[in-house]
């Protein structure tokens, strides 16, 4: 019995020590460093409106359906973060063609002035996560005509808004230029007032 206790005692102490270190100390240290060094990212990269209310995250897209606003990428999960992922169909899958055709039909209904051949691919295809918050500057620009007609905001102002909200490639070489749809729509909302 004494031998059993002598074997169990260090096992229990080591387990408890690592439980405290890995379950409490390490997470607190990492959280403290993250809050000190990159508070915005540690808090979820939240975006606030003029009333200082949280309206979303710059990392997760939202579904904008009002034709007066810029629309983001198609999302097969309807931008529900808990359901992240997409039906990434193979090019040979007929369901992919159906999904793209539906996206194109939706586009035609709201953007009659822009031919389908001018529509950037990111407006009619899903992303891998289904949560992309960004679109290409071209994808934003092709929506200017519709938004200008519905809001009476001059196209030049909308073009400048897109230019102001365009973020370059990370470190100048990773990724492509992009526009965060939520941030763009918040700025658009200011112009509507």
UniProtKB/Swiss-Prot annotation:
Keyword Zinc: no
Membrane topology according to the record: Single-pass membrane protein
Protein name as annotated: Potassium-transporting ATPase KdpC subunit
Family: Belongs to the KdpC family.
Major subcellular site: membrane
Any Pfam family hit: KdpC
Superkingdom, natural source: Bacteria
Keyword Cell membrane: yes
InterPro entries for this protein: KdpC (IPR003820)
GO molecular function, one term: ATP binding
Alphabetized UniProt keyword annotations: ATP-binding, Cell membrane, Ion transport, Membrane, Nucleotide-binding, Potassium, Potassium transport, Transmembrane, Transmembrane helix, Transport
Function: Part of the high-affinity ATP-driven potassium transport (or Kdp) system, which catalyzes the hydrolysis of ATP coupled with the electrogenic transport of potassium into the cytoplasm. This subunit acts as a catalytic chaperone that increases the ATP-binding affinity of the ATP-hydrolyzing subunit KdpB by the formation of a transient KdpB/KdpC/ATP ternary complex.
Location of this chain's protein in the cell: Cell membrane
Subunit structure: The system is composed of three essential subunits: KdpA, KdpB and KdpC.
Transmembrane domains' residue ranges: 14-34
GO cellular component: plasma membrane
Coiled-coil ranges per UniProt: none
